[in-house]
Amino acid sequence: MKILLTGASGYIGKRLLPVLVQNGHEVICCVRNLKRFTVPEHLKASTNIIQVNFLDKDSLKSIPKDIDGAFYLVGYMSESSDFRYLELECAYNFRTAINKTNVKHVVYLGDLLNAQSSLINLASKRIIEIELGRGKYNLTILRCGFIIGSGSY
């Protein structure tokens, strides 16, 4: 299968890429900055890198039409108070672009929210799930807590 991996330069994306390749998939890695992402030599034969910023609709034209599945690992970090709107815009632009492809299944890695989560955070994450769920593909939502591991910062 040909898989689109958004957030490929992030903590989860870097660890998911080799697993996908080892399982026989061709992976298209979406990164905002080509200079900040290097594919390990042993994965290069099954990997392509495209520069995509989900806040820039023109950059979405580089997403191939013949992809079978996608992982949505986009997390927008900002000091700005409107980062929740930016996250929603990314999700909307992703869904719009993916609906123009052959994708049959999208996997979204969301947050596991609890009673201590703010209502604003809870609502914004749920809105992203709803937005992604409006696509013409099947959607799997994985909710996890904060992930910390080797190399995270």
Description of each model-found segment:
Residues K35-T101, L112-A115:
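NAD(P)H-binding glycine-rich loop region in Rossmannoid oxidoreductase-like domains
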Residues C30, L73, L142:
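The conserved SAM/SAH-binding core of class I Rossmann-like methyltransferase domains
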Residues I3-L5, A70, V106:
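Conserved hydrophobic beta-strands of the Rossmann-like cofactor-binding core
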Residues K2, E26, N48, H105, ...:
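Structural signature of beta-strand start/N-cap positions in the alpha/beta core
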Residues Y76-Y153:
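Glycine-/Pro-rich loop/turn segments that contact NAD(P) or position catalytic residues
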Residues H25-R32:
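Conserved glycine-rich Rossmann-like NAD(P)H-binding loop of the short-chain dehydrogenase/reductase
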Residues I3-H25:
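N-terminal Rossmann NAD(P)H-binding glycine-rich loop of SDR-like oxidoreductase domains
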